[in-house]
């Protein structure tokens, strides 16, 4: 057997020996630090490249995985969105929305307008952009979220469900106001909003202005409490409207 072939075979065996325990062992920083104490510059350069490659691989896998976990009903993007029917608040520009800067606050966003004006498209597109930036997102219709919470509560799994929702940095609650919510559903939806305080952004799409949310929840006090959580305790309550157009 030629020397080059033998060396290659020996290298392959050594790589297999390294990979077997690597699949079972999480990285321990102290062990790594101890080994780096006696590492040569070349060895340290190798470890540095390895660490960065591992981080890049994990981030790429996360960005690929997040859109599927979010629960988007369709693949909508900002590139093909028509902004001409959107009326932004006087103190807020479109760039503030497209940049996802509201996630840094965190701030809530309310998209208000008649059915069929592109609110859901925009909410999905923002959520998908957030996913591509490594931000965990969850998408629900208001009715679907309430049903999910009610079922979890009945099965004694409410805490687990709320913990799952809390893992997202951005929550989209679509079609708020299309279906009335009873007292128990209102209480559970308020719990989601309360848990999100100062840690998550909620994007609402609705056909009812925030002042009329009492009709949706069947409880004006509960509706007011949700509005207070978003508009007073958070830095900004972003409510902007859509006008009906033949395009949608």
Walk through the language-model features, giving the residues of each:
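Charged, compositionally biased N-terminal leader segments and the immediate start
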Residues: 1-30
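Conserved phosphate/pyrophosphate-binding and hydrolysis machinery centered on Walker-type P-loop NTPases
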Residues: 8, 36-44, 71-72, 84-87, ...
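Interdomain "pre-motor" coupling segment immediately N-terminal to P-loop NTPase/helicase cores
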Residues: 20-74
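N-terminal pre-Walker A segment at the start of P-loop NTPase domains
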Residues: 76-100
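Conserved P-loop
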Residues: 91-167, 214-217
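Walker B motif beta-strand of ABC-family P-loop ATPases
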Residues: 170
